[in-house]
Amino acid sequence: MARINRISITLCALLFTTLPLTPMAHASKQARESSATTHITKKADKKKSTATTKKTQKTAKKAASKSTTKSKTASSVKKSSITASKNAKTRSKHAVNKTASASFTEKCTKRKGYKSHCVKVKNAASGTLADAHKAKVQKATKVAMNKLMQQIGKPYRWGGSSPRTGFDCSGLVYYAYKDLVKIRIPRTANEMYHLRDAAPIERSELKNGDLVFFRTQGRGTADHVGVYVGNGKFIQSPRTGQEIQITSLSEDYWQRHYVGARRVMTPKTLR
Protein backbone atom coordinates (compact mmCIF):
# COMPACT_ATOMS: atom_id res chain seq x y z
CA MET A 1 0.00 0.00 0.00
CA ALA A 2 2.75 2.32 0.93
CA ARG A 3 4.49 1.47 -2.35
CA ILE A 4 1.42 2.36 -4.33
CA ASN A 5 1.19 5.70 -2.59
CA ARG A 6 4.82 6.55 -3.38
CA ILE A 7 4.28 5.69 -7.02
CA SER A 8 1.15 7.83 -7.09
CA ILE A 9 2.92 10.74 -5.49
CA THR A 10 5.79 10.42 -7.92
CA LEU A 11 3.44 10.37 -10.94
CA CYS A 12 1.56 13.38 -9.61
CA ALA A 13 4.81 15.26 -9.11
CA LEU A 14 5.92 14.43 -12.63
CA LEU A 15 2.58 15.43 -14.05
CA PHE A 16 2.61 18.71 -12.10
CA THR A 17 6.11 19.46 -13.30
CA THR A 18 5.44 18.65 -16.99
CA LEU A 19 2.15 20.48 -17.50
CA PRO A 20 3.23 24.11 -16.78
CA LEU A 21 6.53 23.82 -18.70
CA THR A 22 5.05 22.89 -22.10
CA PRO A 23 3.14 26.18 -22.78
CA MET A 24 6.09 28.24 -21.60
CA ALA A 25 8.38 26.37 -23.91
CA HIS A 26 6.02 26.95 -26.79
CA ALA A 27 5.69 30.64 -25.90
CA SER A 28 9.43 31.09 -25.72
CA LYS A 29 9.92 29.52 -29.14
CA GLN A 30 7.21 31.68 -30.70
CA ALA A 31 8.74 34.81 -29.15
CA ARG A 32 12.13 33.93 -30.59
CA GLU A 33 10.66 33.35 -34.05
CA SER A 34 8.72 36.65 -33.87
CA SER A 35 11.83 38.54 -32.79
CA ALA A 36 13.85 37.06 -35.64
CA THR A 37 11.15 37.94 -38.17
CA THR A 38 10.94 41.51 -36.85
CA HIS A 39 14.73 41.87 -37.06
CA ILE A 40 14.79 40.61 -40.67
CA THR A 41 11.94 42.95 -41.61
CA LYS A 42 13.66 45.94 -40.00
CA LYS A 43 16.92 45.07 -41.77
CA ALA A 44 15.15 44.79 -45.13
CA ASP A 45 13.36 48.11 -44.55
CA LYS A 46 16.65 49.75 -43.63
CA LYS A 47 18.31 48.41 -46.79
CA LYS A 48 15.38 49.60 -48.90
CA SER A 49 15.50 53.05 -47.26
CA THR A 50 19.25 53.29 -47.81
CA ALA A 51 18.86 52.27 -51.47
CA THR A 52 16.08 54.85 -51.98
CA THR A 53 18.18 57.58 -50.35
CA LYS A 54 21.19 56.74 -52.54
CA LYS A 55 19.01 56.73 -55.66
CA THR A 56 17.54 60.14 -54.73
CA GLN A 57 21.00 61.57 -54.08
CA LYS A 58 22.27 60.18 -57.38
CA THR A 59 19.31 61.68 -59.28
CA ALA A 60 19.81 65.07 -57.60
CA LYS A 61 23.54 65.00 -58.37
CA LYS A 62 22.85 64.13 -62.01
CA ALA A 63 20.29 66.96 -62.31
CA ALA A 64 22.75 69.41 -60.73
CA SER A 65 25.45 68.28 -63.17
CA LYS A 66 23.12 68.83 -66.14
CA SER A 67 22.16 72.27 -64.82
CA THR A 68 25.84 73.22 -64.42
CA THR A 69 26.62 71.98 -67.93
CA LYS A 70 23.74 74.00 -69.40
CA SER A 71 24.85 77.07 -67.48
CA LYS A 72 28.43 76.69 -68.73
CA THR A 73 27.21 76.14 -72.29
CA ALA A 74 24.98 79.24 -72.16
CA SER A 75 27.84 81.29 -70.72
CA SER A 76 30.20 80.02 -73.41
CA VAL A 77 27.69 80.85 -76.17
CA LYS A 78 27.17 84.34 -74.73
CA LYS A 79 30.93 84.96 -74.54
CA SER A 80 31.36 83.70 -78.11
CA SER A 81 28.57 86.01 -79.29
CA ILE A 82 30.13 89.02 -77.54
CA THR A 83 33.58 88.19 -78.95
CA ALA A 84 32.16 87.79 -82.47
CA SER A 85 30.35 91.11 -82.17
CA LYS A 86 33.52 92.88 -81.00
CA ASN A 87 35.54 91.30 -83.81
CA ALA A 88 32.94 92.39 -86.39
CA LYS A 89 33.01 95.97 -85.08
CA THR A 90 36.82 95.99 -85.15
CA ARG A 91 36.89 94.67 -88.72
CA SER A 92 34.30 97.25 -89.78
CA LYS A 93 36.28 100.06 -88.15
CA HIS A 94 39.50 98.94 -89.82
CA ALA A 95 37.72 98.69 -93.17
CA VAL A 96 36.33 102.22 -92.82
CA ASN A 97 39.73 103.58 -91.82
CA LYS A 98 41.39 101.75 -94.69
CA THR A 99 38.81 103.05 -97.18
CA ALA A 100 39.13 106.58 -95.84
CA SER A 101 42.92 106.55 -96.10
CA ALA A 102 42.75 105.08 -99.60
CA SER A 103 40.13 107.59 -100.78
CA PHE A 104 41.97 110.81 -99.97
CA THR A 105 45.42 112.28 -100.52
CA GLU A 106 46.77 115.26 -98.68
CA LYS A 107 47.99 118.00 -101.02
CA CYS A 108 49.86 121.02 -99.77
CA THR A 109 50.30 124.48 -101.25
CA LYS A 110 53.50 126.32 -100.42
CA ARG A 111 53.40 130.09 -100.26
CA LYS A 112 56.49 132.19 -99.73
CA GLY A 113 56.56 133.66 -96.25
CA TYR A 114 53.59 131.57 -95.08
CA LYS A 115 53.04 128.12 -93.64
CA SER A 116 52.11 125.36 -96.06
CA HIS A 117 48.35 124.95 -96.49
CA CYS A 118 47.25 121.32 -96.84
CA VAL A 119 43.88 119.91 -97.85
CA LYS A 120 42.57 116.40 -98.42
CA VAL A 121 41.77 115.63 -102.05
CA LYS A 122 39.68 112.70 -103.22
CA ASN A 123 41.71 110.27 -105.31
CA ALA A 124 40.50 109.64 -108.83
CA ALA A 125 41.16 105.90 -108.45
CA SER A 126 39.18 105.56 -105.24
CA GLY A 127 35.83 105.44 -107.01
CA THR A 128 33.16 107.88 -108.07
CA LEU A 129 30.88 110.00 -105.92
CA ALA A 130 27.55 108.68 -104.83
CA ASP A 131 25.03 108.98 -107.64
CA ALA A 132 23.01 111.66 -105.86
CA HIS A 133 26.06 113.81 -105.17
CA LYS A 134 27.40 113.28 -108.66
CA ALA A 135 24.11 114.37 -110.22
CA LYS A 136 24.03 117.46 -108.00
CA VAL A 137 27.55 118.49 -109.03
CA GLN A 138 26.80 117.89 -112.71
CA LYS A 139 23.67 120.01 -112.53
CA ALA A 140 25.49 122.90 -110.83
CA THR A 141 28.36 122.67 -113.32
CA LYS A 142 25.93 122.86 -116.22
CA VAL A 143 24.34 126.02 -114.76
CA ALA A 144 27.78 127.63 -114.34
CA MET A 145 28.83 126.70 -117.87
CA ASN A 146 25.65 128.20 -119.33
CA LYS A 147 26.21 131.47 -117.44
CA LEU A 148 29.80 131.66 -118.68
CA MET A 149 29.02 130.83 -122.31
CA GLN A 150 26.43 133.61 -122.42
CA GLN A 151 29.21 136.13 -121.72
CA ILE A 152 31.42 135.21 -124.69
CA GLY A 153 32.15 138.26 -126.84
CA LYS A 154 31.55 140.80 -124.08
CA PRO A 155 34.39 143.26 -123.42
CA TYR A 156 36.90 143.03 -120.60
CA ARG A 157 36.36 145.56 -117.86
CA TRP A 158 38.67 145.94 -114.89
CA GLY A 159 36.74 145.41 -111.63
CA GLY A 160 33.59 144.34 -113.52
CA SER A 161 31.48 141.43 -112.23
CA SER A 162 28.12 141.59 -114.03
CA PRO A 163 26.80 141.25 -117.60
CA ARG A 164 25.72 144.88 -117.47
CA THR A 165 29.15 146.30 -116.65
CA GLY A 166 31.40 143.65 -118.17
CA PHE A 167 33.97 141.44 -116.41
CA ASP A 168 37.56 141.16 -115.45
CA CYS A 169 39.02 137.64 -115.04
CA SER A 170 38.05 137.11 -111.39
CA GLY A 171 34.75 138.98 -111.81
CA LEU A 172 33.69 136.44 -114.46
CA VAL A 173 34.41 133.53 -112.09
CA TYR A 174 32.65 135.29 -109.21
CA TYR A 175 29.52 135.84 -111.34
CA ALA A 176 29.40 132.17 -112.43
CA TYR A 177 29.73 130.62 -108.95
CA LYS A 178 28.48 133.05 -106.30
CA ASP A 179 24.90 131.66 -106.30
CA LEU A 180 25.87 127.99 -106.63
CA VAL A 181 28.24 127.45 -103.70
CA LYS A 182 27.83 128.20 -100.01
CA ILE A 183 31.43 129.33 -99.55
CA ARG A 184 32.48 132.92 -100.10
CA ILE A 185 34.07 133.45 -103.51
CA PRO A 186 36.87 136.06 -103.28
CA ARG A 187 37.23 138.87 -105.83
CA THR A 188 40.86 138.46 -106.83
CA ALA A 189 42.67 135.63 -108.64
CA ASN A 190 45.31 135.33 -105.92
CA GLU A 191 42.69 134.97 -103.15
CA MET A 192 40.82 132.36 -105.19
CA TYR A 193 44.02 130.37 -105.61
CA HIS A 194 44.52 130.29 -101.83
CA LEU A 195 40.86 129.58 -101.01
CA ARG A 196 40.83 127.00 -98.20
CA ASP A 197 37.63 125.31 -99.37
CA ALA A 198 38.90 124.79 -102.92
CA ALA A 199 40.71 121.49 -103.47
CA PRO A 200 44.00 121.47 -105.45
CA ILE A 201 43.63 119.53 -108.70
CA GLU A 202 46.33 118.05 -110.93
CA ARG A 203 46.28 119.21 -114.53
CA SER A 204 45.63 115.64 -115.71
CA GLU A 205 42.49 115.51 -113.50
CA LEU A 206 40.81 118.71 -114.71
CA LYS A 207 37.03 118.64 -115.14
CA ASN A 208 34.49 121.14 -116.42
CA GLY A 209 34.09 123.95 -113.92
CA ASP A 210 37.57 123.72 -112.35
CA LEU A 211 39.42 127.01 -111.94
CA VAL A 212 42.79 127.36 -113.73
CA PHE A 213 45.36 129.90 -112.54
CA PHE A 214 48.25 131.74 -114.16
CA ARG A 215 51.00 134.11 -113.09
CA THR A 216 51.39 136.56 -115.95
CA GLN A 217 52.76 139.72 -114.33
CA GLY A 218 54.63 138.50 -111.27
CA ARG A 219 52.07 139.72 -108.75
CA GLY A 220 51.46 137.20 -105.99
CA THR A 221 51.25 133.47 -106.61
CA ALA A 222 48.50 133.88 -109.23
CA ASP A 223 47.21 137.01 -110.98
CA HIS A 224 44.94 135.56 -113.66
CA VAL A 225 42.12 132.98 -113.55
CA GLY A 226 39.86 131.19 -116.00
CA VAL A 227 37.38 128.29 -115.95
CA TYR A 228 38.12 124.92 -117.56
CA VAL A 229 35.44 123.93 -120.10
CA GLY A 230 36.81 120.58 -121.30
CA ASN A 231 38.91 119.38 -124.23
CA GLY A 232 41.99 121.19 -122.94
CA LYS A 233 40.35 124.63 -123.12
CA PHE A 234 39.27 127.35 -120.69
CA ILE A 235 37.09 130.44 -120.80
CA GLN A 236 38.59 133.74 -119.68
CA SER A 237 38.33 137.51 -119.75
CA PRO A 238 41.94 138.27 -120.80
CA ARG A 239 42.74 141.96 -120.53
CA THR A 240 41.72 145.47 -121.56
CA GLY A 241 40.92 145.70 -125.25
CA GLN A 242 39.97 142.02 -125.56
CA GLU A 243 36.70 140.13 -125.23
CA ILE A 244 35.66 137.13 -123.17
CA GLN A 245 36.82 134.07 -125.11
CA ILE A 246 37.69 130.38 -125.03
CA THR A 247 41.42 129.63 -125.18
CA SER A 248 43.53 126.46 -125.41
CA LEU A 249 45.65 125.52 -122.42
CA SER A 250 48.19 124.01 -124.80
CA GLU A 251 49.23 127.40 -126.17
CA ASP A 252 52.85 128.15 -125.26
CA TYR A 253 52.06 131.37 -123.41
CA TRP A 254 49.51 129.77 -121.09
CA GLN A 255 51.64 126.67 -120.56
CA ARG A 256 54.55 128.84 -119.42
CA HIS A 257 52.44 130.85 -116.97
CA TYR A 258 50.23 128.04 -115.63
CA VAL A 259 50.51 127.65 -111.82
CA GLY A 260 47.73 125.26 -110.86
CA ALA A 261 44.02 124.46 -110.58
CA ARG A 262 41.34 124.39 -107.89
CA ARG A 263 37.92 122.71 -107.64
CA VAL A 264 35.27 124.83 -105.93
CA MET A 265 32.18 122.80 -106.84
CA THR A 266 31.97 119.65 -104.72
CA PRO A 267 29.11 118.00 -102.78
CA LYS A 268 30.50 119.68 -99.66
CA THR A 269 30.54 123.23 -101.08
CA LEU A 270 27.35 123.27 -103.16
CA ARG A 271 24.25 124.97 -101.79
Curated annotation (Swiss-Prot):
User: Per the record's keyword annotation, is Cell wall biogenesis/degradation included, yes or no?
Assistant: yes
Q: Which Pfam families match?
A: NLPC_P60
The UniProt entry, under SUPFAM superfamilies, shows: Cysteine proteinases
Keyword Translocase: yes or no? no
Q: Where is the composition biased (Low complexity)?
A: 65-86
KO phenotype (gene knockout): A triple mepS-mepH-mepM mutant is inviable, whereas a double mepS-mepM will grow on a nutrient-poor medium but not on a rich medium, suggesting the 3 endopeptidases are functionally redundant in vivo. Depletion experiments of the double or triple mutants lead to cell lysis, as well as significantly decreased incorporation of mDAP into peptidoglycan sacculi and increased amounts of the enzyme's substrate (Tetra-Tetra-anhydro muropeptide).
- Which residues, if any, are the signal sequence? 1-27
Q: Which UniProt keywords apply?
A: Cell wall biogenesis/degradation, Hydrolase, Protease, Signal, Thiol protease
Q: Where is this region: Disordered?
A: 27-102
GO biological process per UniProt: capsule polysaccharide biosynthetic process; cell wall organization; peptidoglycan metabolic process; proteolysis
Q: Which InterPro entries match?
A: NLP_P60_dom (IPR000064), Papain-like_cys_pep_sf (IPR038765), Peptidase_C40 (IPR051202)
GO molecular function terms noted in the UniProt entry: cysteine-type peptidase activity; endopeptidase activity
The record's EC number reads 3.4.-.-
| Family classification | Belongs to the peptidase C40 family.
| Free-text function comment from the UniProt entry | A murein DD-endopeptidase with specificity for D-Ala-meso-diaminopimelic acid (mDAP) cross-links. Its role is probably to cleave D-Ala-mDAP cross-links to allow insertion of new glycans and thus cell wall expansion. Functionally redundant with MepM and MepH. Partially suppresses an mepS disruption mutant.
Q: What is this protein called?
A: Murein DD-endopeptidase MepH
